């Protein structure tokens, strides 16, 4: 009898993707984040579904419905905090996943990398719209400030903003459409993730050395399934410690105050995972310039394959590039810190210097260092 795993049309696809998949024998823990992102997405879709059963997307009742979920629904508080902190875990895994891709040169798989950047943008859009839904002070003012940025687009800007708002300010129409988009986008993300995997399995996985590993492949199951389970247990442990001991650690206290269009919070800031981009936006005094810098701070990832001038794929054997990479990581941490600080001296100048350094490292320093390393290695 033939093995059903290898003959059944549906099970055969799963088999080729997760069981008999030939995988490089030397991939490290940095390759765990793909599966962890899949887990995060599943957690977010499930908890989000249960939250949507009790949530109402109306400006009058939205805040009360979230309170009702936390107080009256069975384990509603748990579902809500898993969803809120699950988003933070999602972004931690995303940043580490992208960082791994940059360090080990995974961006040379053009299609996989570009779909990944589109995925990152979609997840960011989804998270932003989700932050608006509880209709607290920071939800309302965050939505107002970020959507208003589109008014910097010449000619059509103001019309575009009012079209997104569904009126002349952030109101019921805005909240309703944000809820609709926040609900549908995770399913689009899941579909894009499938395309991401499809392209990845066309070429096979990269590995820390950056060398072709066709001569040394092992089956995904049991070697990497057991390794992924370890990552899953660690992720769930960290998430549950966060949820059960300090659920509001990464949130903003202002969001426990119902939205009030007549009272502006002293410091309007997004969730922690957007602070680096927010700092870049604030560093440029010109509105349009700031918006372009904000968009380009993410889209610049698409340029990595074009800026790769090294003869080696991975940074594993390139100590100079490694130093520059870790300076870039430190710079992003600095930007995240600056994004949460008030707009005053010395934070303004630190933010501007960190923003300049961010673009300079990616566009100039890394390619130049790559060429220097080629010379040193007589390539």
From Swiss-Prot:
Gene Ontology biological process terms, A to Z: mitochondrial electron transport, ubiquinol to cytochrome c
Sequence positions that bind heme b b566: 97, 196
Binding residues annotated for a ubiquinone, in chain numbering: 201
Cofactor descriptive note: Binds 2 heme b groups non-covalently.
Gene Ontology terms for molecular function: metal ion binding; ubiquinol-cytochrome-c reductase activity
Cofactor: heme b
UniProt membrane topology term: Multi-pass membrane protein
Transmembrane segments: 33-53, 77-98, 113-133, 178-198, 226-246, 288-308, 320-340, 347-367
Disulfide bonds listed in the record: none
Example of a GO cellular component annotation carried by this entry: mitochondrial inner membrane
Keywords in alphabetical order: Electron transport, Heme, Iron, Membrane, Metal-binding, Mitochondrion, Mitochondrion inner membrane, Respiratory chain, Transmembrane, Transmembrane helix, Transport, Ubiquinone
Pfam families the record matches: Cytochrom_B_C, Cytochrome_B
Localization per Swiss-Prot or TrEMBL: Mitochondrion inner membrane
Key word Methyltransferase present: no
Positions bound to heme b b562: 83, 182
Domain of life: Eukaryota
Job description of the protein: Component of the ubiquinol-cytochrome c reductase complex (complex III or cytochrome b-c1 complex) that is part of the mitochondrial respiratory chain. The b-c1 complex mediates electron transfer from ubiquinol to cytochrome c. Contributes to the generation of a proton gradient across the mitochondrial membrane that is then used for ATP synthesis.
Family assignment from sequence similarity: Belongs to the cytochrome b family.
Subunit structure, interactors included: The cytochrome bc1 complex contains 11 subunits: 3 respiratory subunits (MT-CYB, CYC1 and UQCRFS1), 2 core proteins (UQCRC1 and UQCRC2) and 6 low-molecular weight proteins (UQCRH/QCR6, UQCRB/QCR7, UQCRQ/QCR8, UQCR10/QCR9, UQCR11/QCR10 and a cleavage product of UQCRFS1). This cytochrome bc1 complex then forms a dimer.
Remarks, miscellaneous: Heme 1 (or BL or b562) is low-potential and absorbs at about 562 nm, and heme 2 (or BH or b566) is high-potential and absorbs at about 566 nm.
Protein name: Cytochrome b
Organism ancestry: Eukaryota, Metazoa, Chordata, Craniata, Vertebrata
Gene from which the chain derives: MT-CYB
